[in-house]
């Protein structure tokens, strides 16, 4: 469960702009703010089942986008290589202020 | 015109998986293979107008995806910073084989 929440949060970070306003709202209440389905249902005055179905479909959409675009996967590959690069540069004493700064700028582009 | 073709090719590279089979086909004939609308119409046995409308809508979709996800923009920002980093490392004699290799791997993740 924790792993799924974590993955959904990450996918949401990358693809939320492709979701509808309603999808965004439900998913962020559920995964980011940890509301229960019942609480979200009350908040939006719709049935618990409607919330459940909507979130379920959104999860499928997010996985579909990831399958097609792979933004999360590429991000994680990049993170791993940035760490390796940083370790290599540090070990060789190559990580001076300028190099460090450029590397930081690179890492800040998600 | 050349600039637009170039941009459409780049956007197509990033977002083609989000297009329908037909959209992909028309756009790649038009922008990648430089067919005329008339030639594509003949190829698919539909009207020139239908091809035009479809490609026009696809262009709008590609721009919309870029607006929402910014994969091309981020790619270009990254390219620029990779060049800077490489220049800095080269100038300081820090670009040895290992560092070069890790950097190449990083650049190969689009």
Swiss-Prot record, chains A, B:
NCBIfam families: PRK00118.1-4, PRK00118.1-5, PRK00118.1-6, YlxM
Domain of life: Bacteria
Protein name according to UniProt: UPF0122 protein lwe1821
Function: Might take part in the signal recognition particle (SRP) pathway. This is inferred from the conservation of its genetic proximity to ftsY/ffh. May be a regulatory protein.
Family label: Belongs to the UPF0122 family.
InterPro entries: RNA_pol_sigma_r3/r4-like, UPF0122, UPF0122_fam_protein, WH-like_DNA-bd_sf
Species whose genome carries this gene: Listeria welshimeri serovar 6b (strain ATCC 35897 / DSM 20650 / CCUG 15529 / CIP 8149 / NCTC 11857 / SLCC 5334 / V8)
Matching HAMAP family: UPF0122
């Amino acid at each position: 469960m924790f792993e799924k929440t974590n993955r959904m949060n990450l996918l949401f970070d990358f693809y939320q702009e492709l979701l509808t306003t309603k999808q965004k709202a439900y998913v962020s209440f559920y995964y980011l703010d940890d509301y229960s389905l019942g609480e979200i249902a009350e908040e939006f005055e719709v049935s618990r089942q409607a919330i459940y179905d909507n979130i379920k479909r959104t999860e499928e959409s997010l996985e579909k986008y990831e399958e097609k675009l792979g933004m999360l996967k590429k991000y994680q590959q990049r993170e791993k290589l940035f760490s390796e690069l940083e370790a290599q540069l540090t070990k060789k004493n190559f990580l001076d202020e300028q190099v460090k700064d450029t590397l930081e700028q690179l890492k800040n582009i998600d």
